[in-house]
Regions:
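Active-site neighborhoods of enzyme catalytic cores
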Residues: 70-75, 79-178, 185, 296-317
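Active-site cores that bind ATP or allylic diphosphates and position pyrophosphate for catalysis
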Residues: 119-270
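Phenylalanine-focused residue identity feature
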Residues: 16-19, 24, 170, 189, ...
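Catalytic adenosine-cofactor/nucleotide-binding cores of aminoacyl-tRNA synthetases and other
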Residues: 116, 224-225, 235-317
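N-terminal Rossmann-like or analogous alpha/beta NTP/dinucleotide-binding catalytic cores
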Residues: 2-128, 220-238, 293-298
Length: 317
């Protein structure tokens, strides 16, 4: 079970010059909505508050879900909101050689898995019945010792340590100390999917390392993924960024607001006043920022120091 502890006050002064790169990493599955705007705003504000660079990376590695033209719409919406990125936008589909190289580096820790989703689900159900509900969250290791006769390799999985258990911990700037036993709570996880696409965990770690990402600000729905990414960073010899996971926007049913749960695009070509009233100001309020403004420049001039104050109040700057 992912555990969180009370935030620890920062006792070391950080050199602001070291905070260089923070990414915003949208999926091109549709236009931006309020939930994705909150994540974009938090990462943008954090970059500006620390005098760093804000990078945009289109995470289009999941080809089946990509929507034609969505990446251009996302970039245009960011600019209309006054969020201009530094450097060139990158696309994951242009970086597959980096993922190939990382997989080669992990060769001794990766094995082929021939399990279908149904087979994994059935195994997890049996384990849950024997050992309790938490067992259903862990890959049962069916193919760890080799493919059974007649099985065809589908996905590639990364071995996690068996004994002793491997507990990965980190200090999240928003949530405090977070720990996860990836051996017993996750198990061996996929780095290349059965459909041939690269798994999110591997692609994002490789890209963060290649781009020199120092700080990651994103939604709390990805908090559970972070220990796996830290483990991959260890194996690949990559530095660990700082992490800050902001709350996610929920719909009326208590589900994460997303394209799959009916989130509506906020940028429909309306003017700046509508963007402020229906997108930027609500996103800022959701993040806990008391900001008022009647223009984009005024909004950002107020939002950046408000973000600094919020983080200092939380001992998270």
């Amino acid at each position: 079970m992912l555990t969180r502890r009370r935030p620890l006050a920062h006792t070391l002064a950080h050199d602001s010059a070291s905070f260089l790169h923070r990414p915003f990493r949208p999926l091109p599955t549709g236009p931006l909505h309020l939930g994705s705007l909150v994540a974009a705003m938090a990462s943008y504000l954090d970059a500006k508050a620390h005098g760093g660079q804000w990078l945009v990376r289109i995470e289009d590695v999941d080809g089946d879900r990509n929507v034609a033209g969505a990446d251009r719409h996302i970039l245009a919406s960011l600019q209309r909101c006054g969020m201009q990125w530094d450097g060139d936008v990158t696309w994951q589909t242009q970086r597959t050689a980096l993922y190939d190289a990382a997989l080669a580096q992990l060769a001794d820790s990766v094995y082929p898995c021939g399990c279908s989703r149904r087979e994994i689900a059935d195994s997890q159900t049996r384990l849950a019945a024997q050992h309790g509900a938490n067992a259903s969250l862990v890959y049962p290791g069916t193919c760890r010792a080799g493919l059974a006769p007649g099985k065809v390799a589908r996905a590639l999985r990364l071995r996690t340590p068996v004994e002793p258990a491997h507990v990965v911990g980190f200090q999240d700037r928003w949530h405090g100390r977070v720990e996860q036993d990836i051996t017993h709570e996750v198990g061996d996880f996929v780095v290349r999917r059965a459909d041939g696409f690269w798994a999110y965990q591997l692609a994002v770690v490789v890209d963060d390392g290649a781009q020199g990402i120092t700080d990651i600000v994103r939604g709390a729905d990805l908090l559970d993924s972070t220990p796996r990414q830290l483990y991959l960073q260890e194996l690949l010899g990559l530095p660990h960024p700082r992490y800050l996971h902001v709350p996610v926007v929920l719909n009326d049913d208590g589900e994460k607001l997303s394209k799959q749960t009916g989130a509506q695009a906020f940028d429909n070509g309306a003017g700046t006043a509508d963007l402020l009233a229906h997108a930027l100001l609500p996103a800022a309020r959701f993040l806990g920022l008391a900001v008022t403004a009647d223009s984009l420049p005024a909004f950002w001039q107020a939002a950046i120091p408000a973000w600094k104050r919020l983080l200092r109040e939380r001992d998270a700057f």
